[in-house]
Amino acid sequence: SLIVNKSSPKILKTSNLSHYQMIRQFVETLHRWGKATYIGFNSIDFDEEFLRSTLFKTLEYPYLTSTSGNTRGDLLGLARAANLYYPKTLKNPISEKGNAIYKLDQIAPLNGIEHGDAHSAIGDVVATVGIAKIIYKNASNVWKASQLTTDKNQTLEIIKKELYFCTNEYF
């Protein structure tokens, strides 16, 4: 992480905040921002789990991103669904087995998104926003449908009301 973000161990020693203080500032910032939809690339299975674990360890409420009017989504699943329903929404590299690859650092450049250092915080944000814009533009129905299912209760209402609905999972 230090290498990817071009930092040094020295910055860890000279930080003005403890881990707990940093997380407190983070939580206070989220509260100050108010209700939001949090979307990342592969964020549900990685970032959200890491965040919840960190919040729990610091005695903070671990479900900040999915309660009190906040919702969350994952652009990885959305990218896969967009290409399923609107083929060629995104350009993907192909694996040796002939499968589309959905790694952010590989699909971003193929789709004209120059995002600097892959896996750096700002680089991944730039790439994620770029991919989101492409999906919004080229597969707007998939984008709109995904926004209806970022909240558990709203999703349950859709399931109860609709005669048919579709969900996509990838393994």
Residue ranges: model-predicted function:
Residues 4-23:
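Metal-dependent phosphoesterase signature
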Residues 22-30:
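Generic hydrophobic alpha-helical segments
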Residues 133-171:
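Acidic two-metal-ion nuclease catalytic site recognized across multiple nuclease folds
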